[in-house]
Amino acid sequence: MNTIPYVVEQTKLGERSYDIYSRLLKDRIIIIGSEINDQVASSVVAQLLFLEAEDAEKDIYLYINSPGGSTTAGFAILDTMNLIKPDVQTLCMGFAASFGALLLLSGAKGKRFALPNSEIMIHQPLGGAQGQATEIEITAKRILKLKHDINKMIAEKTGQPIERVAHDTERDYFMTAEEAKAYGIVDDVVTKK
């Protein structure tokens, strides 16, 4: 059962009721709290564009608790983060894995955070192929290119040598918040706002 809480605010005109996500959006907070798919990506992209239109100078806060998901959906979010003018601060609360971790490390430099008990995981892209041998070969080439591109991105954003990133992402590579800070995925582990 998915229950979305509502909050009530007093205004000059009386009471106003918001679902919690709309209320957080007023404070420029976007939450990714699920697997990243096309629907989640469309919602996050729309929120990023809306907040840029509202005020292109103020930071946007992206809170992440996600096991990852679709690379194409994830890149839609990541490319929009890079496209818009406001800095996007990222915060891992709980778990940022796979593309969730890529979004976390793609926040504005100096503004990437994790809560103390967060866990971060990077790995190579997952995929499958079926059909004729030629189709399988095409898919294999695509996923190998994607693996290289993602490793390069992680290396650039963290300052780690690409050889280390390639080695670490061969399998699921789990990190605590402090280990993610040492790796360069986040800039700080926060305990207070």
From Swiss-Prot:
Family matches, as SUPFAM superfamilies: ClpP/crotonase (SSF52096)
Active site: 98 (nucleophile), 123
Subcellular location: Cytoplasm
EC nos: 3.4.21.92
Protein family (similarity comment): Belongs to the peptidase S14 family.
Pfam families listed in its UniProt record: CLP_protease
The protein's name in its UniProt record: ATP-dependent Clp protease proteolytic subunit 1
GO BP field: protein quality control for misfolded or incompletely synthesized proteins
Reaction(s) catalysed (UniProt annotation): Hydrolysis of proteins to small peptides in the presence of ATP and magnesium. alpha-casein is the usual test substrate. In the absence of ATP, only oligopeptides shorter than five residues are hydrolyzed (such as succinyl-Leu-Tyr-|-NHMec, and Leu-Tyr-Leu-|-Tyr-Trp, in which cleavage of the -Tyr-|-Leu- and -Tyr-|-Trp bonds also occurs)
Cellular component per GO, a single term: cytoplasm
Chief place of localization: cytoplasm
Organism superkingdom: Bacteria
Entries under CDD domains matching the protein: S14_ClpP_2 (cd07017)
Single GO term (MF): serine-type endopeptidase activity
Enzyme class: hydrolase
NCBIfam families to which the protein is assigned, alphabetical: clpP, PRK00277.1, PRK12553.1
InterPro entries xrefs: ClpP, ClpP/crotonase-like_dom_sf, ClpP/TepA, ClpP_His_AS
Keyword Heme belongs to the record: no
Subunit structure of this chain's protein: Fourteen ClpP subunits assemble into 2 heptameric rings which stack back to back to give a disk-like structure with a central cavity, resembling the structure of eukaryotic proteasomes.
Role description: Cleaves peptides in various proteins in a process that requires ATP hydrolysis. Has a chymotrypsin-like activity. Plays a major role in the degradation of misfolded proteins.
